[in-house]
Curated annotation (Swiss-Prot):
Localisation: Cytoplasm
GO biological process: nucleotide-excision repair; SOS response
Described function: The UvrABC repair system catalyzes the recognition and processing of DNA lesions. UvrC both incises the 5' and 3' sides of the lesion. The N-terminal half is responsible for the 3' incision and the C-terminal half is responsible for the 5' incision.
CDD domains registered for this protein in UniProt: GIY-YIG_UvrC_Cho
GO CC terms of this entry: cytoplasm; excinuclease repair complex
Record-linked InterPro entries: GIY-YIG_endonuc, GIY-YIG_endonuc_sf, GIY-YIG_UvrC_Cho, RuvA_2-like, UVR_dom, UVR_dom_sf, UvrABC_protein_C, UvrC
Gene this protein is translated from: uvrC
Top-level taxonomy: Bacteria, Thermotogati, Thermotogota, Thermotogae, Thermotogales
Keywords: Cytoplasm, DNA damage, DNA excision, DNA repair, Excision nuclease, SOS response
Protein name: UvrABC system protein C
Family annotation (Pfam families): GIY-YIG (PF01541), HHH_5 (PF14520), UVR (PF02151), UvrC_RNaseH_dom (PF08459)
Record family assignment: Belongs to the UvrC family.
Length: 557
């Protein structure tokens, strides 16, 4: 420890605050304390390897005095978020979790995003993108908030969503009704769902009393669909409870998010060397997750009154329902730990089998899909620590005159790894020919990486021009089959979309009166020929603004 650091520690103030160890002006560790003097004196006699490294590397110590522990906690969280010091524990997402963002524009729009920034009102994170899409679709039908990002001042007439009754039309002056739609959406996503359910029930009953059974059925269906979307998360509690439940073991943290009696998400994070207080700082105080009124833990936290941060209660269960939720969270945690144990075992076996130097933490998988050489596409999927990392998935469109899987693989490998770092292991769906094509492509760009394949016939592992036959229940084979199936699924889904869009373009080109703008609208709205075939004349006419041309389209189809 440098002498000037020792002197600063001995002169540290008694007040609460934040301390920052720096090396060459860069923060390497940031901490908080009720009493800076007491906390910093513990660094004079390091008890762990981490503390020893901090004091050995630091050439500067800065302290910031604040009024109370709450201010220290928030300041610590903000500084860690800003500087990301290397010795502070970090929260690592084990999956990609979506947020719902309401923009901060004068007339806001609503969208699904991957990251939480300071540019609007955010809700989440949620467990599934599909769940969020389904939820927003039904809520938009009920409320009519806008999802377009268009400059409203330049719009002369409303889009098809307005004509379908899914948008209030702020672009044509319906500002107040749109503001009300956004308010109701915020209330709903904050957990106050009763207002929307009561509104739908009232509308259904009113139309029923008026013998307007068509509209009564419409609101009944909206009510049922909304309930079904929420229940699709798997758990509904009789009591209208809203809370988060946090459990952890080792470096893994699991949070169950319950809003108004519905389980809206289960999320898991890794935090090496972190405790519950670290998690609250990294997840809630730094703004990654909404602060709920109630946070259920396995035991009390003694150090701080978290109500000053926005929580009304932080602690162990107070009711049978909360106890049940805690048990559910524990079971989810046990399952996550079990899965991680199995995946780690499979990865270790894979490392031994292929005689790899590095642990295969990141595996990238490639597959090619085409139809007799047409509409060729490639998928690239990513597995980290044995689990899919969907936010890193990529798709590639390949132009070629004749079908050639080997050349397609070479093309994708060169495009990908000329610009991106290599994974620990590259997986290719195929046998020796496909694997060799990937190896050759890497050599052409001066790169080297282990490449493994899985031959479709008898599911044989292919590596370095040799075939390895494994028992069907071998953990390595199960892992490689999962990666193979995921690359195939992702490639086929992209190929299908490309084929359908190309077919749709081809048909639309033959319809008189369909120019580039109308063609783009039809493709964006319907996506496939099948969807247009099943649409009504009125719906197609609303999209393109012409009943006559809509009739021509249906005649061609």
């Amino acid at each position: 420890m440098k002498e000037k650091i020792r002197k600063k520690i001995l002169l540290a103030p008694e007040e609460p605050g934040v301390y920052i160890f720096k090396n060459k002006g860069v923060p390497i560790y940031i901490g908080k304390a009720k009493r800076l003097s007491s906390r910093l004196r513990s660094y004079l006699n390091p008890q762990t390897e981490k503390v020893f490294r901090i004091v050995e590397e630091a050439d500067e110590l800065e302290t910031i005095v604040v009024m109370n522990e709450r201010e220290a906690f928030i300041l610590e969280a903000n500084l860690i978020k800003k500087y990301r010091p290397k010795y502070n524990v970090r929260l690592k997402d084990t999956n990609f979790y979506p947020y719902i963002r309401i923009s901060d524009d004068e007339i806001p729009y609503v969208e699904i995003v991957k990251r939480k920034l300071r540019d609007g009102t955010y809700f989440g994170p949620y467990t599934s993108v599909q769940f969020v899409r389904n939820l927003l679709e039904i809520l938009q039908k009920i409320m009519g908030f806008r999802t377009c990002k268009s400059d409203l001042k330049r719009i002369k007439r409303p889009c098809f969503l307005y004509h379908l009754g899914r948008c209030t039309g702020p672009c044509i002056g319906n500002i107040e009704s749109h503001g009300e739609a956004v308010r109701r959406l915020k209330e709903f996503l904050s957990g106050n769902m009763e207002e929307v359910f009561d509104y739908l029930k009232e509308k259904m009953e009113t139309h029923s009393r008026m013998l307007d059974f068509e509209n009564a059925a419409k609101y009944r269906d909206l009510l049922l669909n909304l309930s079904n979307v929420l229940e699709s998360q798997g758990v509904v509690f009789e009591e209208s409870i809203s809370c988060d439940v946090l459990v952890h073991a080792h470096d893994l943290f699991v949070v169950l998010r319950v809003r108004n009696g519905y389980l809206v998400g289960k999320i898991s994070f890794e935090m090496e060397g972190g405790n519950v207080e670290d998690f609250i700082r990294e997840y809630y105080v730094s703004g990654r997750g909404d602060i709920p009124k109630t946070l259920i833990l396995e035991s009390d936290l003694d150090e701080m009154d978290y109500s000053s941060l926005g929580f009304e209660y932080v602690g162990p269960p107070r009711s049978t329902t909360e106890e049940d939720l805690l048990e559910k969270a524990k079971k989810n945690l046990e399952n996550e730990l079990k899965m991680r144990g199995l995946r780690k075992e499979a990865l270790e076996e894979l490392m031994k089998l292929l005689n790899m130097k590095d642990f295969p933490y990141r595996i990238e998988g490639i597959d090619i899909s085409h139809l007799q050489g047409k509409y060729t596409v490639a998928s690239l999927v990513v597995f980290e620590d044995g689990f899919p990392k969907k936010s890193d998935y990529r798709r590639y469109k390949i132009e070629q005159d004749h079908p050639d899987d080997y050349e397609s693989i070479r093309t994708v490998v060169k495009r990908r790894y000329s610009k991106h770092p290599l994974p620990n292991l590259l997986f290719v769906d195929g046998g020796i020919g496909q694997v060799n094509a990937a190896v050759e492509a890497l050599k052409e760009i001066g790169k080297d990486c282990p490449v493994v394949g899985l031959a479709k016939k008898e599911e044989t592992v292919v590596f370095e021009n040799r075939e390895i036959k494994l028992p069907h229940d071998h953990p390595v084979l199960r892992l490689l089959v999962q990666i193979r199936d995921e690359t195939h699924r992702f490639a086929v889904s992209y190929h299908r979309k490309r084929r359908e869009k190309e077919s749709l373009r081809s048909v639309l080109d033959s319809v008189p009166g369909i120019g580039p703008i109308r063609k783009k609208k039809l493709i964006e709205y319907f996506g496939s020929l099948e969807n247009i075939r099943s649409a009504s004349l009125e719906e197609i006419a609303r999209v393109i603004g012409s009943a006559e041309i809509a009739k021509r389209i249906l005649d061609v189809l």
